[in-house]
Amino acid sequence: MKLKKNDRRVAIKEAIELNPFITDYELCEKFDVSIQTIRLDRTHLNIPELRKRIKLVAEQNYGRIKSIEANEIIGDLIQVNPDVSAQSLIEITIDSVFAKSEIARGHVLFAQANSLCVALIHKPIVLTHESQVEFKEKVKLNDTVRADARVIDITDKHYIIEVNSYVSDMLVFKGKFKMYYTSEDE
């Protein structure tokens, strides 16, 4: 049963508040209406499109990082809990894929994961010491990749960070990064 317009708009607003990264396509499937209807409803509710919502969340998080400038992060930093965990999103664009196959270049996924590891560590200097990575599935043009990083160990000079990257719920990249750091007093 379809919702009436006002009820649907309330439900759309609640769905976006619950998950600011939900796409218009996911909303149109959820509410069984056209994508144009979702866009009109969002406009009526003064809710920006997904890209703008991601940028707003990312801008709020950039002030919480110490080791890297915001413009050096590959992707948009959507969540950071310094020295614990972080998330970023990247949309795979035409300049990130091979022309013939439209499959994402591996270094894009690696760069997203690696820069997320650097951003996550709340120290002035952070460098990659070593990494072990696996590319699990193909990532294609227009896919949105969510990278989740979490610290699994800390030693005198290194953080060990695990990164899993997903397209929707499908694991596409897995990595373990050993990151070297220096403290303020060094």
Swiss-Prot record:
Keywords, sorted A to Z: DNA-binding, Fatty acid biosynthesis, Fatty acid metabolism, Lipid biosynthesis, Lipid metabolism, Repressor, Transcription, Transcription regulation
Single GO molecular function: DNA-binding transcription factor activity
Signal peptide range in chain numbering: none
Listed SUPFAM superfamilies: Thioesterase/thiol ester dehydrase-isomerase
Top-level taxon in the UniProt lineage: Bacteria
GO annotation (BP), single: fatty acid biosynthetic process
NCBIfam families listed in its UniProt record: PRK04424.1 (NF003359)
Job description of the protein: Transcriptional factor involved in regulation of membrane lipid biosynthesis by repressing genes involved in fatty acid and phospholipid metabolism.
Family label: Belongs to the FapR family.
Name of the featured protein: Transcription factor FapR
